[in-house]
C-alpha cells in the first residue's frame, strides 16, 4: 500500500531518481511519483508507478479517461475491489497535494508561474535475505535536482538548499520522519512480503544469462572485446574483465543493466586490447541463476580445413576448364557455320541482331 502524503507539505519523486541497486538475495519495493505543471493547459499531470524488484505492478495516471490505480502485473489481479478503491483514492489525493506543492515551490524559489516545473518522490523498502528490513527510502526532487531526503537512520532529513530547509523545519515540527519510519518498517515490509508470495512464480524466478564474447577491430593493432549477458532475471548481475587474472574494472566500458522488453535484462562490458593479446583476457559473469560464476574468452573463428594455396590451385584448374569449354564451343559453332556456307562474322552479326547469345559476341572481341 502507498504511504499517505502530508496534506500541506512537499511530496516528490519518480523517474528522475533511478532505482537503487539492491543486494544479492534481497527484494525491494519502490513507488515513483511525479507531477509536472503545464501553465495554460489545465491541472498538472500526476503519474505514480510501483515496482517490486524490477517488475512494475501498479500505475496511476491523472490524464487517463477515468483515473484509477491499475494493475500492471498478472498477480495483482488477486487484489479485491477494496484495495483498488483505496489506492485510487490515495492517488487522487497525492495528485492534489502535488498541485499545491508546485505552487508552494514557486514561492520558495521566487519563480514565475509561466514555466513548467516538476516535483518527484521515491520511497520504498529493501528486504534482506532473511526477510527483514534492510533499508528504507524517502527521497524528493524538484526540477530534476535533489531537494530533501530521509537519512539512513530513518530519523532525520538532509536538505540540499535554503528552500529545502524550509520544508525540513516543517517536517521536523510535524514528526514526519517518525510517521515515515513507521510505514517503512511496518506496512512497506508487510506488503512486500505479500506481493512476493502472490507473484513468486515471476518475482522469485532466476533465469541465467546467455553469454558470449565478440571481437571488434579498432585499428591495425587494437581491438575491442565485448562480453555480453542476455536474457537474465533478476536484474542484479556482475560482468567484469580480467587480464592475466588481474581485474580490469578501471579500464573497461560498462553499460547499465537494461530491460530487454520481454521481462528479462541485458548487459555488456567491453575492454580495448592489443591485437594478438586477446587470449590473455577473460570475462567473468556472476548471477543468481548460474550454479557457479562463468569465465569466458574470445574464441577466434575456426580456420578453413582446406589450405589457402589449395583453394588457389582449385580455382586455377576451374578457370582452365571453363576457358577450354568456351573455346570448344566457339570452334564447334564456327564449324557449323562453315558447313552452312556462312562465315563466322556473319553468324555473330545475325545472333547479335536477334539479341540471344551474348557470350558468342564477347568471344568475337
UniProtKB/Swiss-Prot annotation:
Membrane disposition: Single-pass type I membrane protein
Alphabetical list of InterPro entries matching this protein: Ig-like_dom, Ig-like_dom_sf, Ig-like_fold, Ig/MHC_CS, Ig_C1-set, MHC_class-I_related, MHC_I-like_Ag-recog, MHC_I-like_Ag-recog_sf
Subcellular location: Membrane
Record-annotated membrane-spanning stretches: 309-332
Modified residues (Phosphotyrosine): 344
Disulphides: 125-188, 227-283
Positions of region (Disordered): 337-361
Keyword Transmembrane in record: yes
Gene Ontology MF: a single term: signaling receptor binding
Positions in the Cytoplasmic compartment: 333-365
Phosphoserine: residues bearing it: 343, 345, 350, 352, 356, 359
Glycosylation sites: 110
Any one of the GO BP annotations: positive regulation of T cell mediated cytotoxicity
Region (Alpha-2) location: 115-206
Spans within the Extracellular topological domain: 25-308
Span list, region Connecting peptide: 299-308
UniProt keyword list: Disulfide bond, Glycoprotein, Immunity, Membrane, MHC I, Phosphoprotein, Signal, Transmembrane, Transmembrane helix
GO CC annotation terms, alphabetical: early endosome membrane; ER to Golgi transport vesicle membrane; external side of plasma membrane; extracellular space; lumenal side of endoplasmic reticulum membrane; MHC class I protein complex; phagocytic vesicle membrane; recycling endosome membrane
Highest taxon above the source species: Eukaryota
Predominant localisation class: membrane
Segments for region (Alpha-3): 207-298
Signal peptide segment: 1-24
Region (Alpha-1): 25-114
Similarity annotation: Belongs to the MHC class I family.
Protein purpose: Involved in the presentation of foreign antigens to the immune system.
Full protein name: Saoe class I histocompatibility antigen, A alpha chain
Native source organism of the sequence: Saguinus oedipus
Amino acid at each position: 500500500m502507498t504511504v499517505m502524503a502530508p496534506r500541506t507539505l512537499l511530496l516528490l519523486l519518480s523517474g528522475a531518481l533511478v532505482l537503487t541497486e539492491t543486494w544479492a538475495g534481497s527484494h525491494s519495493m519502490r513507488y515513483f511519483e511525479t507531477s509536472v505543471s503545464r501553465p495554460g493547459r489545465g491541472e498538472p499531470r500526476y503519474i505514480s508507478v510501483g515496482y517490486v524488484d524490477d517488475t512494475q505492478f501498479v500505475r496511476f495516471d491523472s490524464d487517463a479517461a477515468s483515473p484509477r490505480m491499475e494493475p500492471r502485473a498478472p498477480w495483482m489481479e488477486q487484489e479485491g475491489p477494496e484495495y483498488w478503491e483505496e489506492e485510487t483514492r490515495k492517488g487522487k489525493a497525492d495528485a492534489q497535494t502535488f498541485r499545491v506543492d508546485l505552487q508552494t515551490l514557486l514561492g520558495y524559489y521566487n519563480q514565475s508561474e509561466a514555466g513548467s516545473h516538476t516535483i518527484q518522490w521515491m520511497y520504498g523498502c529493501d528486504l534482506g535475505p532473511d526477510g527483514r528490513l534492510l533499508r528504507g527510502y524517502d527521497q524528493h526532487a524538484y526540477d530534476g535536482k535533489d531537494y530533501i531526503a530521509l537519512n539512513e537512520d530513518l530519523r532525520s532529513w538532509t536538505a540540499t538548499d535554503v528552500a529545502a530547509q524550509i520544508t525540513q523545519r516543517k517536517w521536523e515540527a510535524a514528526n514526519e520522519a517518525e510517521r515515515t519510519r513507521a510505514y517503512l518498517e511496518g506496512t512497506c515490509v508487510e506488503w512486500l512480503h505479500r506481493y512476493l508470495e502472490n507473484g513468486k512464480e515471476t518475482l522469485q524466478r532466476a533465469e541465467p544469462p546467455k553469454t558470449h564474447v565478440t571481437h571488434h577491430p579498432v585499428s591495425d593493432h587494437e581491438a575491442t572485446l565485448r562480453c555480453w549477458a542476455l536474457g537474465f532475471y533478476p536484474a542484479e548481475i556482475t560482468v567484469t574483465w580480467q587480464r592475466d587474472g588481474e581485474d580490469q574494472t578501471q579500464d573497461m566500458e560498462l553499460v547499465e543493466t537494461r530491460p530487454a522488453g520481454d521481462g528479462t535484462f541485458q548487459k555488456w562490458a567491453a575492454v580495448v586490447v592489443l591485437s594478438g593479446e586477446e587470449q590473455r583476457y577473460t570475462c567473468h559473469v556472476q548471477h543468481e541463476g548460474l550454479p557457479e560464476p562463468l569465465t569466458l574468452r574470445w574464441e577466434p573463428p575456426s580456420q578453413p580445413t582446406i589450405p589457402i594455396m589449395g583453394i588457389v590451385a582449385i580455382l586455377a584448374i576451374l578457370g582452365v576448364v571453363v576457358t577450354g569449354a568456351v573455346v570448344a564451343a566457339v570452334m564447334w559453332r564456327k564449324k557449323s557455320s562453315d558447313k552452312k556456307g556462312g562465315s563466322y562474322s556473319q553468324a555473330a552479326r545475325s545472333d547479335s541482331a536477334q539479341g540471344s547469345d551474348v557470350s558468342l559476341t564477347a568471344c568475337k572481341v
